[in-house]
């Protein structure tokens, strides 16, 4: 699994986040919940010590196993990506942004930002990811933080009619120009239709930094990444939270 974990980190760090289309599951026999409990570690990152997550770490057996032995699609949910770290820290430090509101964590992965939003007092939080295994990981992460599991939806919401969200958060999602264009159009419609606020977390990867969306972003906060996150993400040192204001 070391090769898989390193591949995922390298793909996001050097150029982009990997393709969001998860590989088909290789088996239906394994119970995701039991598998995640057995093959991940409950840990916390120095940037957000308030939140504990089940992640793939160097101490996990699959970190060094052959990737083909992994029974599910690529485990993007098992890594705490830098954009998500920055978003989570920002929400924890600024609970007034979520308090009493309806929050969508788009492409949630491990669900840290959704958990941070709930900790900040959001009235409703929906975590969304196209990988259903991410949903099981998210539920376990909620339990790990002594929370009743929040709602999770395993569908591609981009391009669909959005609900009246007060806040949409997304981290590490600007990894492909075509997807970024679709995201921007969809987020604009939500802002204009519902007055939704949009926060984006990204550590400054190439696709994000060169995309026209930067003209419509206002930086809100920048955070230094932990030494381990820097090492795993090939030279990225900081992660920024932006407000999307088209």
UniProtKB/Swiss-Prot annotation:
Keywords, alphabetical: Cytoplasm, Methyltransferase, Mitochondrion, Transferase, Transit peptide
Superkingdom of origin organism: Eukaryota
A single cellular component GO annotation: mitochondrial matrix
Example of a GO biological process term: methylation
SUPFAM superfamilies tied to this protein: S-adenosyl-L-methionine-dependent methyltransferases (SSF53335)
Primary localization: cytoplasm
Location of this chain's protein in the cell: Cytoplasm; Mitochondrion matrix
Transmembrane segments: none
EC number annotated for this UniProt entry: 2.1.1.-
Catalytic activity of the protein: L-lysyl-[protein] + 3 S-adenosyl-L-methionine = N(6),N(6),N(6)-trimethyl-L-lysyl-[protein] + 3 S-adenosyl-L-homocysteine + 3 H(+)
Class of enzymatic activity (EC top level): transferase
MF-aspect GO terms: protein-lysine N-methyltransferase activity
Family: Belongs to the methyltransferase superfamily. ETFBKMT family.
Function recorded in the entry: Protein-lysine methyltransferase that selectively trimethylates the flavoprotein ETFB in mitochondria. Thereby, may negatively regulate the function of ETFB in electron transfer from Acyl-CoA dehydrogenases to the main respiratory chain.
Protein name, per record: Electron transfer flavoprotein beta subunit lysine methyltransferase
Annotated organism of origin: Xenopus laevis (African clawed frog)
Gene from which the chain derives: etfbkmt
